[in-house]
UniProtKB/Swiss-Prot annotation:
Domain USP: 225-555
Xref: InterPro entries: Papain-like_cys_pep_sf, Peptidase_C19_UCH, Ub_carboxyl-term_hydrolase, USP39, USP_dom, Znf_RING/FYVE/PHD, Znf_UBP
Lineage, broadest ranks: Eukaryota, Metazoa, Chordata, Craniata, Vertebrata
Region of interest (Disordered), ranges: 1-61, 75-96
Binding partners and assembly: The U4/U6-U5 tri-snRNP complex is a building block of the precatalytic spliceosome (spliceosome B complex). Component of the U4/U6-U5 tri-snRNP complex composed of the U4, U6 and U5 snRNAs and at least PRPF3, PRPF4, PRPF6, PRPF8, PRPF31, SNRNP200, TXNL4A, SNRNP40, SNRPB, SNRPD1, SNRPD2, SNRPD3, SNRPE, SNRPF, SNRPG, DDX23, CD2BP2, PPIH, SNU13, EFTUD2, SART1 and USP39, plus LSM2, LSM3, LSM4, LSM5, LSM6, LSM7 and LSM8.
Ligand binding (Zn(2+)): 136, 139, 155, 161
Keyword Nucleus: yes
Entry GO MF terms: cysteine-type deubiquitinase activity; zinc ion binding
Zinc finger (UBP-type): 103-200
Basic and acidic residues bias: start-end ranges: 1-21, 28-39, 85-96
Alphabetized UniProt keyword annotations: Cell cycle, Cell division, Hydrolase, Isopeptide bond, Metal-binding, mRNA processing, mRNA splicing, Nucleus, Phosphoprotein, Spliceosome, Ubl conjugation, Ubl conjugation pathway, Zinc, Zinc-finger
Protein name: Ubiquitin carboxyl-terminal hydrolase 39
PROSITE patterns, alphabetized: USP_3, ZF_UBP
């Protein structure tokens, strides 16, 4: 080998050794940098919150370029309260420091209770999502999430609104610092969002006449508060107000434990009606409300969904149709059936009657042929037992002619005259497309709360006509004993009823409005409610209205004895 080639060989060997030395020192340096990375990240205030010994092996073995993505994802996933998250923070020694911040949050004075309204759907104001919804307690808006890049987090940074309430867990948080706030001064907000009642409080509701004061200073009686008319839902408002003043039904829904464990088939949406009605009852009777009215927005959305848009918020509906559908839907959603299984709805409102039906020959037939047909079995009177939720009372036909002053005559009829339909003697003819029938009705069981629906609207081929006849009725002491047969009278000790709710329809059939008169049991006074307006009214004025739906309460033994004394 020549001298030149020997020198080149020694040079190449030396170069390899230097490159290997540089490569190994580079690897050592990179490993040292990787070991220092958590310390450097914590000193820079990085969002990394979990020490490396708690990271999965995949995260430890990942290249340095992937680690920041893992951190961001981990931070965004830590959103809801969970025990594993708290355990990890405890191992890191962060629980004590967070507890100190939780109990001494500096932003509690920024909460604005006057803008808080929990009556509307728990929906993010930016993304249409119900999941993980938070309410900003500074401006009252709803946002989704509280992790990094969530709408609530961005809102807190952009507008310096720091206090948020989880609308499902009822926990308070400070953002963007992301720690839970624990303070007893926030209990009033939690109670407005989800009112609760003890058995003792429920038992005393009808014995108290104490006024409550809202946050804005207005006073109100719990249970006698206005319902917001979103557009054309006053027909539903009146019915819901009436049902909220029926004590057994109200008491059942004020206590959520009575119905929350009822099992329904998978995918059943009807139970939503029960949940929303219970929430509305608790809000109407909340003595610690921030305002003296309630919005039935969530309740009506459930009605629209469960009725398949038969009843809507934006279109006027019929109060009797809505009442009939709502009571039957509520009964079904609570697990009731038509014949056997009972619910609170049937216990309160369901009565029974005998219906006697007799088919009539066609009026155009000769008299001899009619006489022969009446001897056939088909034309003999039949009787069936039937249950009812309400009684329909028929009004006499309104006059077509005007008086001498060119004004329409508004007739009047006593309540007992139209109740004669159910005395078991009075017959009424009913016509179908092909056949005519004579029917008579006799009551066999009177419910604790009796609903009268006065039939004011009749439909023909062209339009709906309203009967303006005024029904004269007493406010108290309506005895229905004479409408029962003798054997049924022996079973019923009390047959005397007092009025507790009176729904009125004013105006034309398609353009009219609804209002309601309700009795407050604690004060013994009557109040008129029309949407948000609440005024007291004299009992004598109630009888002058065009009553459409009435709810009567049967007296018990104690009340009857007091009246007799």
């Amino acid at each position: 080998m020549s001298g030149r080639s020997k020198r080149e060989s020694r040079g190449s060997t030396r170069g390899k050794r230097e490159s290997e030395s540089r490569g190994s020192s580079g690897r050592v340096k990179r490993e040292r940098d990787r070991e220092r990375e958590p310390e450097a990240a914590s000193s820079r205030g990085s969002p990394v919150r979990v020490k490396r010994e708690f990271e999965p092996a995949s995260a430890r073995e990942a290249p340095a370029s992937v680690v920041p993505f893992v951190r961001v994802k981990r931070e965004r996933e830590v959103d809801e309260d969970s025990e594993p998250e708290r355990e990890v923070r405890a191992k890191n020694g962060r629980v004590d420091s967070e507890d100190r911040r939780s109990r001494h949050c500096p932003y509690l004075d920024t909460i604005n209770r006057s803008v808080l309204d929990f009556d509307f759907e728990k929906l993010c104001s930016i993304s249409p999502s119900h999941v993980n919804a938070y309410a900003c307690l500074v401006c009252g808006k709803y946002f989704q999430g509280r992790g990094l890049k969530s709408h609530a987090y961005i809102h807190s940074v952009q507008f310096s609104h720091h206090v948020f309430l989880n609308l499902h867990t009822l926990k308070f948080y400070c953002l963007p610092d992301n720690y839970e706030i624990i303070d007893s001064s926030l209990e009033d907000i939690t109670y407005v969002l989800k009112p609760t009642f003890t058995k003792q409080q429920i038992a005393n509701l009808d014995k108290q006449a104490k006024l409550s004061r809202a946050y804005d200073g207005t006073t109100y009686l719990p249970g006698i508060v206005g319902l917001n008319n979103i557009k054309a839902n006053d027909y539903a408002n009146a019915v819901l107000q009436a049902l909220s003043n029926v004590p057994p039904l109200r008491n059942y829904f004020l206590e959520e434990d009575n119905y929350k464990n009822i099992k329904r088939p998978p995918g059943d949406i009807m139970f939503l009606l029960v949940q929303r009605f219970g929430e509305l009852m608790r809000k109407l009777w909340n003595p610690r409300n921030f305002k003296a009215h309630v919005s039935p927005h969530e309740m009506l959305q459930a009605v629209v969904l469960c009725s398949k848009k038969t009843f809507q918020i934006t279109k006027q509906g019929d109060g009797v149709d809505f009442l009939s559908w709502f009571l039957n839907a509520l009964h079904s959603a609570l697990g009731g059936t038509k014949k056997k299984k009972k619910t609170i709805v049937t216990d309160v409102f369901q009565g029974s009657m005998r219906i006697f039906t007799k088919k009539l020959p066609h009026p155009d037939l000769p008299a001899e042929e009619k006489e022969q047909l009446l001897h056939n079995d088909e034309y003999q009177e039949t009787m069936v037992e039937s249950t009812f939720m309400y009684l329909t009372l028929d009004l006499p036909t309104a006059p077509l002619y005007k008086d001498e002053k060119e004004q329409l005559i508004i007739p009047q009829v006593p309540l007992f005259n139209i109740l004669a339909k159910f005395n078991g003697i009075t017959e009424k003819e009913y016509k179908t497309y092909k056949e005519n029938f004579l029917k008579r009705f006799q009551l066999t069981k009177l419910p604790p709360y009796l609903i009268f629906c006065i039939k004011r609207f009749t439909k023909n081929n062209f339009f709906v006509e309203k009967n303006p006849t005024i029904v004269n009725f007493p406010i108290t002491n309506v005895d229905l004993r004479e409408y029962l047969s003798e054997e049924v009278q022996a079973v019923h000790e009390n047959t005397t009823y007092d009025l507790i709710a009176n729904i009125v329809h004013d105006g034309k059939p398609s353009e009219g409005s609804y209002r309601i008169h309700v009795l407050h049991h604690g004060t013994g006074k009557w109040y008129e409610l029309q949407d948000l307006q609440v005024t007291d009214i004299l009992p004598q004025m109630i009888t002058l209205s065009e009553a459409y739906i009435q709810i009567w309460k049967r007296r018990d033994n104690d009340e009857t004895n007091q009246q007799g004394a």
